[in-house]
Structure formats: C-alpha cells, structure tokens
C-alpha cells in the first residue's frame, strides 16, 4: 500500500505490481509494431477491446430508472450535506444530517457548484440529444456570469481551473486549450459526471470516452481526465445492476499510475487518517470510493464522505453519484429526498437522460462497423 502523494518516479515503479490490470495492446497495434509483417499484408480487422465491453443490464426498467435518478440526485444530496463542513479541518465539527450553513451560509438542502455544473451538463444532453462541447461551455458561462442553474441565482464556489477555462472560452472560443498542467488536476470535472454516465449507460466505451470530452471543457490534466474515466466505468457497472463488490472490484482499465492504484482498490485497506479529502482529483476520488466501500447504504456513505471535511461537498457529491447509482432513490432517506433543493427538477432531468439514452454507441459503428 502506498501514499498517492508519493513522488512520480516511486509510483511508476510501484504500479508495476498492477500490470495485470493494464490492457494488452490491440491486435492492430501488435501488427503495426511487428517488423516481420509485410507492409502490404492484410490489416487485422478492428475489434473492440474486451475491457471496453459493456455490462449487460440485469435490472428491471423500474430498477434501472431508480438507480439513474439516484446517481444525479445523490450528487446533489452529497453536495448539500457536505457543504456544511467545506474548507474546515477534519473533526473540528461533524454533521449527521442535511443542515446547511457552511462558508456560503446556505439553507438546509441547498447545494454548490458541483450540482450547478451537473445540471448544465444534463441540460446539454437533453437539449442536443448528445454531448455538444460548445453548448456545454456556453451553459457553464451562463452559470458563471448570470447564476443559471444556481440554487440562489448567483455563481459561487467556482474552482480556479473552471474559472480559468471559462475565461479562456470567453476570450478565444473553441480555440481555447488549457488546464493541461498537472497542477490543474482538480476535481471540477469528476464532481459533475453523473449525467454522462446516465445518458451513456448502455455503452461502457461511450461512457469512457465521453467522460473525457466533458472533462476537457474545463479540465485537461491527465489525472483529472483519467479519474473521470475510472468513475464513469464504475457508474456504468452500478447503473446496470452491479452491487458494491462488483462495482469496486479491480478491473482491466487503461489508467495512469495514481488512478490505477485506486482502481486496484488499495483504499479499501486504508484507515480514515490515511485518506485525504482535498480538491485534488486523486484525493477526491479515493476518499469518495473509501466512503462507499466502508458503508452499506446511501445515508452512511454520504456522512462518511462529508465528515472527512476539507473539500467535503465535492467528496460527498462524488460519493453520492456512486452510492446513488448503487442504492437508488428508493434507498435514500426520504427526508433528504424531500429537503434537497430542486429535488423534483433533478429527478425529472435524470428521467429525461434515462429515456433519451442511445441504445448503441455511435463511435462503435465508426470504429468497428457495428450497427
């Protein structure tokens, strides 16, 4: 077990023990790299990697919808519970309910930027029938400038990388490229991921790649993107009927060293004192998965995550996405479902994402000829 804040060189050596979780090169790549193969030899047919094969849904339509609503509503509930302890040192205070307050003096049930950005993402899918980069960037700008999709009509709690990206979009439009530096690997794109997972729930490969695209609007650092991909894969499993053990089991995935170590499940052996809850995306994802793993219901997962403090709203929002996808709205405390702001609107958006979800991955048809 290793500290994920260890130096890169040490982590690169350490992660070799999980080489069995890295995908093998495709047959097409192996052929291109084989110097014994003639240049004019017939190309290997394109085939989808096994590790990107989707999980068959084992839920009834009603159960699947319950989990889809749970993923998006769970994000908002986690955000609303966690904001009470946002920016506080761990254990200075504790929370055992949805009580509001915190640095922004919110009413009980109100949430922060995590949910606002997720609602902008959901609106993009619903209005366009797909993810559209410019539509999403402009939705975020309307939130940033005018408070659209904010619980109190104004933008607050926006992260530095997100602000920098939106200012870049306003200056340069589609030509803006930024936030690639490792120092910008904040959690701003993972905390809003649920709409992508719901809309693309029928296809693991679509969830995997579209989590990259939605992240790239504000966060392009490798670890920010890679952590989105890992959570997207886990949400795909949960939304299609997996239980906690299957969802959080190590799996073959193409990941950088720190996300790979999280994928391998080392957080399952860590104590609370070994878990960080900062806004660094690696810390946020590890803390969220630790909270889900060490609980057996939605309520306890949210409180475990929120009481880690520091970036408590984002850790709890990330945990809430996965716990909501595992336990559904039916597994949430009814008083939280009722109290969280915009509850019915959020559930309605989740239903629209669910109903409009494509049955096939268009990229599969392009790459592998599948219809």
Swiss-Prot record:
Catalytic activity: N(omega)-(ADP-D-ribosyl)-L-arginyl-[protein] + H2O = ADP-D-ribose + L-arginyl-[protein]
Enzyme class: hydrolase
GO MF: ADP-ribosylarginine hydrolase activity; metal ion binding
Known cofactor(s): Mg(2+)
InterPro entries linked to this entry: ADP-ribosylglycohydrolase, Ribosyl_crysJ1, Ribosyl_crysJ1_sf, Tri1-like
Keywords recorded for this protein, A-Z: Hydrolase, Magnesium, Metal-binding
Cofactor note: Binds 1 Mg(2+) ion per subunit.
Region (ADP-ribosyl hydrolase domain): 70-362
Ranges where the record places region N-terminal extension: 1-61
Assigned EC number: 3.2.2.19
SUPFAM superfamilies according to UniProt: ADP-ribosylglycohydrolase
Outcome recorded upon mutating residue 157 to N: No longer protects E.coli against S.proteamaculans effector protein Tre1, no effect on growth in the absence of S.proteamaculans
Positions annotated to bind Mg(2+): 112-114, 157, 313
Domain of life from the UniProt record: Bacteria
Domain comment in the entry: The N-terminal extension probably forms a projection that reaches into the active site of cognate toxin Tre1-Pp where it occludes the active site.
Task of the protein: Immunity component of an interbacterial competition system (also called effector-immunity systems). Expression in E.coli neutralizes the toxic effects of non-cognate S.proteamaculans effector protein Tre1 (Tre1-Sp); cannot be co-purified with Tre1-Sp from E.coli, suggesting they do not form a stable complex. Probably acts as an arginine mono-ADP-ribosylhydrolase, mediating the removal of mono-ADP-ribose attached to arginine residues on proteins.
Family listed: Belongs to the ADP-ribosylglycohydrolase family.
Protein name (database record): ADP-ribosylarginine hydrolase Tri1
Species the sequence originates in: Pseudomonas putida (strain GB-1)
Gene that specifies this protein: tri1
């Amino acid at each position: 077990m290793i500290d994920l804040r260890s130096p890169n060189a040490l982590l690169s050596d350490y992660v070799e023990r999980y080489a069995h979780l890295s995908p093998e090169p495709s047959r097409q790549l192996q052929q291109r790299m084989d110097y014994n193969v003639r240049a004019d030899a017939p190309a290997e047919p394109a085939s989808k990697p096994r590790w990107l094969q989707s999980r068959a849904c084992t839920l009834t339509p009603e159960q699947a919808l319950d989990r889809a609503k749970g993923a998006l509503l769970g994000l908002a509930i986690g955000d609303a519970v966690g904001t009470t302890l946002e920016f506080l040192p761990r254990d200075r205070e504790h929370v055992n309910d949805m009580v509001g307050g915190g640095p922004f003096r919110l009413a009980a049930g109100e949430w922060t930027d995590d949910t606002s950005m997720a609602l902008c993402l959901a609106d993009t899918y619903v209005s366009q029938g797909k993810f559209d980069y410019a539509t999403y960037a402009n939705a975020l700008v309307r939130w940033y400038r005018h408070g659209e999709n904010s619980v109190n009509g104004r933008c607050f709690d926006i992260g530095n990388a997100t602000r920098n990206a939106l200012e870049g979009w306003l200056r340069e439009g589609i030509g803006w490229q930024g936030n690639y530096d490792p120092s910008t690997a904040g959690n701003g794109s993972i905390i809003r991921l649920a709409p992508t997972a719901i809309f693309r729930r029928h296809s693991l490969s679509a969830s995997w790649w579209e989590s990259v695209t939605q992240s790239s609007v504000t966060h392009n650092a490798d670890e920010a993107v890679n952590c989105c991909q890992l959570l997207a894969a886990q949400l795909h499993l949960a939304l299609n009927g997996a239980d906690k053990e299957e969802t959080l089991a190590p799996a073959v995935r193409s990941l950088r060293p720190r996300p790979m170590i999280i994928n391998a499940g080392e957080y399952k052996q860590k104590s609370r004192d070994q878990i960080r809850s900062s806004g660094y995306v690696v810390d946020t994802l590890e803390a969220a998965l630790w909270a889900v793993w060490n609980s057996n219901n939605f309520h306890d997962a949210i409180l475990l995550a929120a009481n880690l403090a520091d970036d408590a709203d984002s850790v709890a929002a990330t945990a809430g996405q996965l716990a909501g996808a595992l336990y559904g709205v039916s597994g949430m405390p009814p008083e939280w479902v009722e109290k969280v702001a915009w509850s019915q609107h959020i559930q309605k958006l989740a239903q629209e994402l669910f109903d409009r979800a494509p049955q096939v991955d268009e990229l599969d048809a392009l790459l592998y000829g599948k219809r």
